[in-house]
Amino acid sequence: VYLAAAKVGGILANSKYPADFIGQNLSIQLNVIQSAFDSGVKKLLFLGSSCIYPKFVSQPINEKDLLSGPLEPTNEPYAIAKIAGIKLCESFNRQYGESHNIDYRCLMPTNLYGPGDNYDLKTSHVMAALVKKFSDAKARNELKVTCWGSGSPLREFMHVDDLGDAVLFVLENWDPEMQKFVIKENKYLTYLNVGTGKD
């Protein structure tokens, strides 16, 4: 099972609808993961988000940085829901991994872009918003584009097709020995960053 379903949106949507973002994502994750287990699914891959990491995390982000500091306030409810999904997979592995031979994993993609993206400036993510702003400015012959923020945050981007390849590869080729390269202290760890840094 590949669990990619989620309520998603950009900064404005996250700020305006925090209850929807935490509630709907918690419901999706619990229902799908529990139903997968109840149906005898042995392998599940849950797609999280890089927003699970603290606001001031060092770059490139490492898996061990999870829960090491405060989250970005604008998307904290969404991030908390995604962290709960990770912990749910980890808990299923801890409780049922050996007895039921299950392996529920999580991938944390970077900022995605590609076909089918949402270009509505009120709900889009950063790449689609930038493309839309620059496209509109070009069409109106404007010489300047106003972007949000200070310009200092670092972002890593990944094409959605590359994530698709990574998802298939990880679920089909996951080797428990890979675990020792992520976080040695937690044998039940379920998550792996994809498309971040070089490690």
Predicted regions and their residues:
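Short-chain dehydrogenase/reductase
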Residues: I22, L26, D65, T74-I86, ...
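Structural signature of the Rossmann-like NAD(P)-dependent dehydrogenase/reductase core
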Residues: L3, K43-G48, R105-N111, T146-G149, ...
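Active-site Tyr-X1-5-Lys
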Residues: N31-Q34, P73-T110, A129-R140
